[in-house]
Amino acid sequence: ELVSQLCLKKERVCEGSSLTISCPQKGAGISIARAIYGRTKTQVCPSDGATSNVNCKASNALNVVRDLCRGKSSCTVEASNDVFGDPCMHTYKYLELSYDCSK
């Protein structure tokens, strides 16, 4: 399943918020290419002191988001430990998705 990286849409939301992605074209469904819940960069979603751990990723993020969104025209994912579990305590996390719309 090769998806050209160029046509992927990329969305990001900080922990505690929800992200809604959609495929407005008729008959198109969401196909998730990448999903990260955690922290891999310090400068994203800045917070007081809880951003130094950049080796933090929920291992289940891609499967969770695919289960929620696969084939739908729109879906909402909450960036929270309730959804993904907590991959690293005391770290302010974010959710980053790359997706495209496939017919």
Curated annotation (Swiss-Prot):
The keyword Disulfide bond applies. One of its GO terms (molecular function) is carbohydrate binding. Activity is stable up to 60 degrees Celsius, then decreases and is lost at 100 degrees Celsius. Activity is stable between pH 4 and 7 but decreases at basic pH. Disulfide bonds join 14-45, 23-101, 56-88, 69-75. The keyword Disulfide bond applies. Keywords: Disulfide bond, Hemagglutinin, Lectin. Not glycosylated. Residues 13-102 form the SUEL-type lectin domain. It comes from the Eukaryota. InterPro entries: Lectin_gal-bd_dom (IPR000922), Lectin_gal-bd_sf (IPR043159). Rhamnose-binding lectin. Also binds alpha-D-melibiose, alpha-D-lactose, beta-D-lactose, methyl-alpha-D-galactopyranoside, methyl-beta-D--galactopyranoside and D-galactose but not D-arabinose, L-fucose, D-glucose, D-mannose, D-maltose, D-sucrose, N-acetyl-D-galactosamine, N-acetyl-D-glucosamine, N-acetyl-D-mannosamine-D-xylose or by glycoproteins orosomucoid, thyroglobulin, ovomucoid and porcine stomach mucin. Shows cation-independent hemagglutinating activity against rabbit and human erythrocytes. Homodimer; disulfide-linked. This is L-rhamnose-binding lectin ELEL-1. It comes from Echinometra lucunter.
